[in-house]
Amino acid sequence: TQTREESFDFLMNQRFIHMKLGFTKEGLITAIDDFSIADGGVQGSSGFGTANDQGYGPYYTTKCLNIRQRMEIIDSNTGKMYLSGQFCPFNWDTLTVGLHIIAEKLNKDVIDIAKLNLHGPDSQEDDRVVPSFEACIEAGKKLMNWNWHKAGTKTLPDGRKHGASFRYQICPRHAFSGYDCKLEYRGGQIHLPTQGPITGIFAIECNAMVIAEELNVEYDDVIVDYHWSHKFTPVGGGSDGTTASGWAMKECANILKKNILEQAAYEAENPPAGGMFGGPPQANPLKGYKADELDIAPHPLAEPKEAPAPGPFAAPPVTGPVVYVKSDPSIFKSLASAVSLELVATFSGRPPAALWSLGMGKMLDTMNTCYCEVAVDEEIGAVEILRLGVVADPGKVIRLTSMESQVDQVMFFTQGCQLFEEFIFDDKTGLRLNNNMIEYKKPTVLDVPTVEKDFRETRSGNAVYGASGLSHSLANTHLVICAIYNATGVWVQPPATPDKVLKALGKI
């Protein structure tokens, strides 16, 4: 067992980027030249965050077709990276910085520069607006009371400099995960057999919510059965964990619902024989109705048309899920008594391919935006984040607490890498000196401001209920740095510690 001081996850190695942009006097980007030198760790590391950047990055979300990207990778022998990239996600904030530079040079709002350059839903030649992006911008400006100003021109009452910044991203769904779903009906309840999460993506409850929604029963009527031998697990790359597995589970739930209603219609015409001590079979109010004339409800929707006959074998009042006649909800029977047999439904598959995986930025559906306000004390170099705001459109929010936690997590990353986290190297040997979690400074819960959130639901995605999810797409490397630039007019290499701020200001 390692102590906190002995343990260290190097996570992401260093990367140096030199980007050149050409743009018109209106701010439209006409040329992009990106050269990177990246540390791959050791030979055999994943190219997820290095070579993959050449196919997916922020540049393809713009109307610019004149793009050149080059990368050299060195191996510093720091460790093997099985999946993590250099930036999270990728090199997105090169464009974020570029948009702020253009806005400052032209004395224009950075949001207006972003809107001018963003292409439409279908291609880089598409001049239409992206509805999801427009919805996020409208709500974001209102949330933050957005009022852009030129760098270094706004001073707060306490004498500190005010700065603000903006960033957009795609809400990605990775679309490389397939699922083998199974549902069982037993005694009026729905059972979901699963081995549970295996990579920290705890989407089981989200799947249960989808099942309850599709079958129109209460969440408590869906029983999750955990066992290592069950095949289904709702994992997947990034946001696939919930949205893609939810799509597959939705298909499975509808198969089970069809089976339940068909069995209810069959048993109404062919009632099970009464037991020796159970009395004669009760009259079935669903008799004479076909499966497509029936539906399921979480509870009776009306008083029964005919009161149950009195006597020792009279059925108790129905309180749980029921099968009812769609044309007359007063005709119903409890789900448990309407279907006596055990039923099983299975589905194997995945949702349609996501735009993220098909176009890598060249097609757009669901998007997100984030905003930052800072106060910079130019006398001592201290930076305070005044506000962090996120307006995201995941298509459809499946479970609000999960979405909120996803946002809080990535904004924690955001603040940490831009204000606290720093590698310290020995000048003579090049060795990293702070290889532990005490000397590598991460923010604590006392350091991170409350993130103001507003979620849009345009249903623009193509996973369950039009969702795409969020993944780590809001994690960024330069949102705070851009706000510091807007406050002071100087660029600070992250992390923006007081000494670095003062050095950038020319005071030390």
Language model feature labels by segment:
Residues 1-135, 142, 150-508:
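Cofactor-binding beta-sheet edge motifs in enzyme active sites
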